[in-house]
Amino acid sequence: MRKIKEVIVVEGRYDQNTLAQVVDATVVTLGGFAVFNDKEKVAFLRRLAAERGLIVLTDSDGAGFVIRNYLKGALPKEQVKQAYIPDIHGKEKRKRAPGKEGKLGVEGMKPEVILEALRRAGATFLDETAEPAAEKTPITKADLMEWGLAGGAGSSQRRQALLRRLDLPEHLTANGMLEALNLLTDREKLAELLQDQ
C-alpha cells in the first residue's frame, strides 16, 4: 500500500473504499452533486488544500467532469492537482447495469490504474525517495493550434484520437487536455508522439 501526502477528493463512498485498498492517504468524499450546496465542505477542502494539497480524482463521465470543474472554480488552483482515470467501458461489480455513459468509475478501476493516475497527477509518494525533476518545456495553446489540436477544422477529432491514445477521458476540453498533457509529458515528447501518428 502506497502512502500519499496529499488529500484525495473523490465523488462517493464506494470510490473511497476502493482507494482505501490501494493507498494510505486521507480520502474525502464529496457526496456527488451535494457538494454544490455544501459551503462547509468547500471551506474544509480549501483548508486541506492549504495544509497538505489536494488531488481531485473523479469519474471520467460527464457528471465527474461537472464536479471537477466546479472544484476548479472553488479551490485555489496552485494547491490542487488533477488526476484523470482513463475511459474504460464496463460495469462495476455492485451494479446491475452500467452507468449512463457505460464507463467504469473510480470504484471500478484496478489498483495499478489508480496508482498510475495519481502518479501522473504529481502525487507525493512518501514511501519513495524523490528524484529531482528534470526541467521540461511546457506545452502551450499555441502548440496545440500548430499541431492541429485546437482552433481549426478537424481539431476536435484529432484531440479525441490523442486522448484515446494517451488513455485520457474523452470529456477533456482543449484547456483541460493542455493541463493534463503538461502533467504527463513535455513539448518535445508530445511533438515526437504526434509525428509518429
Give each language-model segment a name.
Residues 85-134, 138:
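Activity-critical C-terminal alpha-helical subdomain
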Residues 116-119, 123, 128-197:
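C-terminal, charge/polar-rich interaction regions
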Residues 13-16, 42, 64-68, 107-115, ...:
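Amphipathic alpha-helical transducer elements in NTP-driven molecular machines
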Residues 10-11, 58:
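Short beta-strand scaffold positions
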Residues 6-7, 13-17, 21-51:
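Acidic, glycine-rich catalytic loops of TOPRIM or P-loop NTPase phosphate-binding modules used
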Residues 44, 62-76, 112, 123-127:
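Phosphate- and other anionic-substrate recognition elements at nucleic-acid/protein interfaces
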Residues 34-35, 57-67:
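Acidic, metal-coordinating catalytic cores used for nucleic-acid/nucleotide bond scission
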